[in-house]
Amino acid sequence: MLIFAWLLTFSAPGAGLEAVSSAELCGDCHRAIHETWKASRHAHAMDSRLFQDVLHWTEADLGAAARRTCLGCHAPLALEIGDLTLQKKVSWEGVTCDYCHSVREVFMAAPNPKAKLKFDRMKTGPWKEADPGKHGAIFSDVHTSSQICAPCHEYRNALGFPVLTTFSEWKASRYAKEGRPCQSCHMPRVEHGGAARLVGATLLGAERHRQCEFCHAASAAGDVVEQRARRSSAAKSNLRDMVNLHEMKGSHSIEQLTSAIKAQLEAAREGNKLKVTVAVANVAAGHYVPTGSPLRQLVLEIRADTGGGKHFREERVYRRTVVDQQAKPVEREHIAFVKGVTAISDTRLAPDEKRSETFLFDVPPGDQTEIKAIFWYYYSPLATTESQKRVTFLTLSRLVQ
C-alpha cells in the first residue's frame, strides 16, 4: 500500500476561490515583475509539456491519489481551493504570486518543510518599507531566506528517501554560512529601471530594446510599480530603489549553467596513446550539480576524431542512481518520488568541488586529432522533445598533432 506525503502547505480554514488572486491582477500594477515571472519556470510549472506528461504517467502508474503530491508544488493554489481537476484558470498559473506572497511561516520540522498560508489583502514580502497602495504589506523574514524555497525544494517520501535535497545541499555549503540565500543567485536584485530594461531585452532582444529605450527611457523608473499606483503611495513613503527579479533562472538557463560549471581541456601524447584531461568544477552553484529531480544528469562527453578516420567517444555522468525496494534502478521521476528507497551512488558535483577526468585513446603519433569536451544537462527520460530532454551549454576543443 502506498502512502503519499503531499501536505507541503496548510492554510487558514476557509480558503476558497474568492480568497485567492490571479497573477494578472498583480500585473496591473507590478508590470515588470509580472512579465519576468510569466517567462519563468515557476509560471509554467503546471502547463509545461513535460510536467503534463509526467502527471499522466503518475496517475496511470500510481493512481489518482498521487496527483496531490505533484500539484502540491506545481499548482499549489489548486490544492488550496480544492480544484484538483484543474477547472479554474488560477490553478494553471503554476507557482503564482498569491501563493508565495501569502506564505506567513515555514516550519522546517521533519519529515518535510511546510508553508503556512493566509489568504487576505495583506501580502508578505522581503521589504520592510513596502507600500504597494492597493493592498497591505507585511515584512517577512522568511522571504529573505532560503526557507521560502524549502517546501518545494526539499522532499522526503513516505519510505524515508530524500527525493529532493536542494535546500539541505545549500544548508551544508559555504553559501549558507556566508548568508547567501537562494534568492541571491536565482532572484538577484536590480534597480527599478533595471527591471524594465531586463524585461525589454528579454522579450525583444538587446538591439531592438535599445531602439525602444531611446524614446521610452524616461519612463523606465516606473517599471516595478505602475505609475498611478506609485503616485497613490508616494505621499506615504519613499519607495525602495531595488527589486528582486522574478525570472527564477535555474538549470534551464544557459547563463546559470555556464556560470556554475567551469572546465579546462588539456591533451598530450603518451607514447601511442592520446591522453585527454578535463578539469571540471562547480564554482558558483550553492547546491550540487545537478540538483532537483533525482534523474537529472550532468554529462561530460569527449569526442576524439582523427585525421585517419577514427572516431572515439567516452562519457562521464554526474548523477544519483536511485533504486526501489527491489533494488531495481528507478528510471521515471514519479516512481522515484513515491517508490525510491535509496541512492546507491551519487557522483554529482558538490558546491566548490573540483575534479580531474582523464581519458586515454589509441591514437598513434602523427595522426592529427580534434578533441572536443561537450557538457550537457539532461533533464528527464520522459521528455518528448530534445529541448525538454537536454541542453548543451559548454563546448571546449583542442587540435593535437
Q: Where are the language model's segments positioned?
A:
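Short, conserved sequence motifs used for protein processing/export or organelle targeting and
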Residues: 157, 189-401
